[in-house]
Amino acid sequence: MAKQSMKAREVKRAKLVVKFAEQRATLKTTINDVNATDEDRWSAMLKLQTLPRDSSPVRKRNRCSVTGRPHGFLRKFGMSRIKVREHMMRGEIPGLKKASW
């Protein structure tokens, strides 16, 4: 189980990403616009750097919804591989069964 503080930190990051997404997108379009002046592009770059570091979607980490485990995360289920296996063995995930050949 992950510490509660780590789970809370990820929730905080997710909120920041949503809050600053539009502002970040407009600044990035200005920076990548070849028709914009160099001064505009430079000022947009400086404004982008003043935004909170955790507002970048790259910093968000996928975690298991049950345990908070950061590794072995399966996007389709939103859980770690360990919890997916446990739920699968109990028959709680429809259509999933242990492989045998």
UniProtKB/Swiss-Prot annotation:
GO terms for cellular component: cytoplasm; small ribosomal subunit. GO terms for biological process: translation. InterPro entries: Ribosomal_uS14, Ribosomal_uS14_bac/plastid, Ribosomal_uS14_CS. The keyword rRNA-binding applies. Signal peptide: none annotated. Keywords: Ribonucleoprotein, Ribosomal protein, RNA-binding, rRNA-binding. The keyword Repeat does not apply. GO terms for molecular function: rRNA binding; structural constituent of ribosome. It comes from the Bacteria. Belongs to the universal ribosomal protein uS14 family. Binds 16S rRNA, required for the assembly of 30S particles and may also be responsible for determining the conformation of the 16S rRNA at the A site. HAMAP family: Ribosomal_uS14_1. Part of the 30S ribosomal subunit. Contacts proteins S3 and S10. This is Small ribosomal subunit protein uS14. It comes from Psychromonas ingrahamii (strain DSM 17664 / CCUG 51855 / 37).
